[in-house]
């Protein structure tokens, strides 16, 4: 938490800071940062979660039920959006969904009381943008692999009158090209906004108790803390919803490449 003259900077939590020595790669210094650390933590946590749930038991435990619930949820979504062809892409979309979900949830851990500062990886457009570009690249590869140049027919909706094609095709093309930007931006904005609001409210709590008029400051602090509890619960919901929306839109984009709707 950054504090200057008693003020709390709500944007300090998003700063990427180096944690140790790096190495030189092609003239550029590569550093291990707090962002990289929490991506590693998310990957390890996710791996342990999946490993624990994949141990088959005659009577499934809660851990196994949770893992099977997630896999069944994504598998059903892929089948509903793409059909039987969706099974090929389920591992990718499932990995994407779980990674985003774990990154979102890890960023919500109240570790500040222990002197640790969790970093929300998905609060950076560089990370969400790369995830979106990977999904977009898969859509392009699948589209051209399956349909060749006929993939360009995606930009001319079925039944479009011939005179309207010069107008509709560019609009559809631009709409298609902005998909990775909107996909990455949506997740970035949603996660950043909630964390900024929580940090601002935490500043109200601290400064309220340090106010000269203690009774008034205490009221502000209590109200702010109550709001923090409610918004934290909402942020947990947003963490799951945003992971789902990212996975859902990815599956819909893949469906366009597979079925050329």
UniProtKB/Swiss-Prot annotation:
In terms of SUPFAM superfamilies, this protein maps to: F1F0 ATP synthase subunit A (SSF81336)
Q: Where are the transmembrane segments?
A: 30-50, 63-83, 96-116, 125-145, 151-171, 187-207, 214-234, 235-255
Assembly, in brief, is:
F-type ATPases have 2 components, CF(1) - the catalytic core - and CF(0) - the membrane proton channel. CF(1) has five subunits: alpha(3), beta(3), gamma(1), delta(1), epsilon(1). CF(0) has three main subunits: a(1), b(2) and c(9-12). The alpha and beta chains form an alternating ring which encloses part of the gamma chain. CF(1) is attached to CF(0) by a central stalk formed by the gamma and epsilon chains, while a peripheral stalk is formed by the delta and b chains.
| Keyword field contains Phosphoprotein | no
Q: Which domain of life is it from?
A: Bacteria
Which species is this record about? Sphingopyxis alaskensis (strain DSM 13593 / LMG 18877 / RB2256) (Sphingomonas alaskensis)
Its taxonomic placement starts with: Bacteria, Pseudomonadati, Pseudomonadota, Alphaproteobacteria, Sphingomonadales
Q: Which CDD domains match?
A: ATP-synt_Fo_a_6 (cd00310)
Name this protein carries in UniProt: ATP synthase subunit a
């Amino acid at each position: 938490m950054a504090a200057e003259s008693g003020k709390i900077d709500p944007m300090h939590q998003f700063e990427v800071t180096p944690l140790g020595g790096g190495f030189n790669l092609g003239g550029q210094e590569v550093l291990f940062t707090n962002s990289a650390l929490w991506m590693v933590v998310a990957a390890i946590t996710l791996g342990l979660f999946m490993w624990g749930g994949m141990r088959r038991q005659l009577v499934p435990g809660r851990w196994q039920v949770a893992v099977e619930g997630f896999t069944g949820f994504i598998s059903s979504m892929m089948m509903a959006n793409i059909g039987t062809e969706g099974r090929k892409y389920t591992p990718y979309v499932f990995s994407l969904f779980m990674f985003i979900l774990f990154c979102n949830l890890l960023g919500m851990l109240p570790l500040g009381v222990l002197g640790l500062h969790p970093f929300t990886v998905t609060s950076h457009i560089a990370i969400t943008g790369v995830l979106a570009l990977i999904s977009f690249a898969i859509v392009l590869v699948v589209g051209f692999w399956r349909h060749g140049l006929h993939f360009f027919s995606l930009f001319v909706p079925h039944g479009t009158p011939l005179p309207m094609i010069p107008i509709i095709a560019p609009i559809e093309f631009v709409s298609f090209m902005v998909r990775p930007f909107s996909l990455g931006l949506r997740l970035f904005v949603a996660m950043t906004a909630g964390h900024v609001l929580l940090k601002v409210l935490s500043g109200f709590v601290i400064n309220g108790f340090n106010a000269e008029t203690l009774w008034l400051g205490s009221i502000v602090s209590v109200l702010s803390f109550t709001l923090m509890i409610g918004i934290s619960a909402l942020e947990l919901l947003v963490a799951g919803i945003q992971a789902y929306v990212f996975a859902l839109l990815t599956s819909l984009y893949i469906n366009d490449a597979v079925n050329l709707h």
